[in-house]
Curated annotation (Swiss-Prot):
Belongs to the allatostatin family. The modification Leucine amide is found at residues 58, 79, 90, 137, 159, 170, 181, 192, 206. The keyword Signal applies. GO terms for biological process: neuropeptide signaling pathway. It comes from Helicoverpa armigera (Cotton bollworm). This is Helicostatins.
Length: 225
């Protein structure tokens, strides 16, 4: 009987030792007012929220967004969305350096269509696309205004379009290379049946003499009697 009561005594002693200690001036929980029931509630509530430094994860960003479907300007790029230094491609060209900042672009966008029309009227059709990257199929950089050299630009060459120094090919030669079959300079224009007019020293052969040479030979062969 004595041995069976020993475990019960140990349990009672352990419960007494493990009971929370209370100060004498501390009130009982059931005696507290409703507003004093949880004095540490203000300190426990922030534990459920993360710091903005660690407020990221699946569907959570390190920055605060107005909406979860809106990106910051730093990440505002993708299909059809490019930042201004990279806003070029098919049909999109980079702007000049003087118009790269946002203030100048806002000023340009505020101009009405009438002012833009007056600005473009000052230039001809060839100069409307006079930009460093404004060239392509049928679009080239423009310098002069003459009709013949309207497309004779630094990049204005291709199929049937050449600069004057490269404007040669089948049936097209520059003046320095404009010779070939049936095409010679005057100093090289000699051959079978072709002699230079002023080079009479080579204009002889079977039945071919100049009139001056024939008269001189006749005078030498015949003497007056």
């Amino acid at each position: 009987m004595l041995y069976s009561s020993l475990p019960v005594c140990f349990l009672v002693l352990g419960a007494a030792l493990c009971a929370p200690e209370r100060m004498q001036n501390e009130a009982e929980p059931h005696d507290l007012q409703p507003h004093e029931a949880e004095p540490h509630s203000d300190h426990v509530a922030p534990l459920a929220k993360r710091s903005p430094h660690y407020d990221f994860g699946l569907g959570k960003r390190a920055y605060s967004y107005v909406s979860e479907y809106k990106r910051l300007p730093v990440y505002n790029f993708g299909l059809g969305k490019r930042s201004r230094p990279y806003s070029f491609g098919l049909g999109k060209r980079s702007v000049d350096e003087d118009q790269s900042n946002d203030e100048q672009q806002l000023t340009t966008s505020d101009l009405d269509q009438a002012a833009l029309a007056e600005l473009f009227d000052q230039y001809d059709d060839a100069e409307k696309r006079a930009r460093p990257y404004s060239f392509g199929l049928g679009k080239r950089f423009a310098d002069d205004e003459t009709s013949e050299e309207k497309r004779a630009r630094a990049y204005d060459f291709g199929l049937g379009k050449r600069l004057p120094m490269y404007n040669f090919g089948l049936g097209k030669r520059a003046r320095s290379y404009n010779f070939g079959l049936g095409k010679r300079y005057s100093k090289f224009n000699f051959g079978l049946g072709k002699r230079e007019r002023d080079m009479h020293r080579f204009s002889f052969g079977l039945g071919k003499r100049s009139g001056d040479d024939v008269s001189a030979d006749d005078s030498d062969n015949y003497f007056d009697v």
